């Protein structure tokens, strides 16, 4: 098995969170949530939304590239590749409101994404049929979209 180069490892493992010995996918999603929370306190809310959207787009394409590189070294859809979980959890965070209950929405976004990612309902599992990095990324993107929808509905109902 050949050794992968540094940049695909850095991106694909979610800055190393994928090397967690326990639940690497959850570790990647947790790191992404922590990054988002830090940005929440550092940026004006509109800038946070634009930054989050940019992160989703950038890391989706970078994740496809990194996963393709890493699959050739580590095999198909390696558990250490968690950039997909990072992108997946950033998607529902786009629906988090800027109010005094924002942190409950962050917790809900994280939990809903992990549930959709693990259970893989409503076509999420079918996204894994795509080959290479696209298959690695797209199931988590769809899980993130479903989570986004539920967070948006919760915002509409709860406020």
From Swiss-Prot:
Entry EC no(s): 3.1.3.64
Subcellular location field: Membrane
EC supergroup of this enzyme: hydrolase
Segment forming the signal sequence: 1-16
Keyword Metal-binding in record: no
Molecular function GO labels: phosphatase activity; phosphatidylglycerophosphatase activity; phosphatidylinositol-3-phosphate phosphatase activity
Membrane topology term: Multi-pass membrane protein
Catalytic reaction annotation: a 1,2-diacyl-sn-glycero-3-phospho-(1D-myo-inositol-3-phosphate) + H2O = a 1,2-diacyl-sn-glycero-3-phospho-(1D-myo-inositol) + phosphate
TM segment ranges: 30-50, 54-74, 104-124, 134-154
Keyword Hydrolase (UniProt): yes
Superkingdom as given in the UniProt entry: Bacteria
Phenotype of null mutants: Phosphatidylinositol dihydroceramide (PI-DHC) and phosphatidylinositol diacylglycerol (PI-DAG) is absent; synthesis of other glycerophospholipids is unaffected.
Gene Ontology process terms (BP): phosphatidylinositol metabolic process; sphingolipid metabolic process
GO cellular component, one term: membrane
Keywords linked to the UniProt accession: Hydrolase, Lipid metabolism, Membrane, Phospholipid metabolism, Signal, Transmembrane, Transmembrane helix
Record's function text: May be responsible for the conversion of phosphatidylinositol phosphate diacylglycerol (PIP-DAG) to phosphatidylinositol diacylglycerol (PI-DAG), making it a key enzyme in the inositol glycerophospholipid biosynthesis pathway.
Name of the protein this chain belongs to: Putative phosphatidylinositol-3-phosphatase
């Amino acid at each position: 098995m050949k050794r992968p180069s540094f940049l695909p490892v850095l991106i694909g493992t979610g800055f190393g969170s994928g090397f967690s010995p326990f639940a690497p996918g959850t570790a990647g999603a947790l790191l992404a949530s922590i990054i988002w929370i830090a940005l929440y306190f550092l940026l004006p809310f509109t800038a946070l939304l634009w930054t989050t959207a940019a992160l989703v787009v950038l890391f989706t394409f970078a994740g496809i590239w990194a996963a393709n590189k890493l699959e050739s070294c580590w095999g198909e859809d390696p558990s250490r590749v968690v950039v997909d979980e990072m992108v997946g959890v950033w998607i529902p965070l786009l629906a988090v409101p800027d109010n005094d209950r924002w942190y409950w929405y962050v917790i809900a976004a994280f939990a809903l994404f992990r549930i959709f990612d693990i259970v893989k309902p409503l076509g999420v599992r079918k996204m894994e049929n795509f080959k290479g990095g696209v298959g690695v990324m797209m199931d988590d993107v769809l899980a993130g979209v479903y989570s986004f929808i539920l967070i948006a509905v919760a915002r509409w109902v709860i406020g």
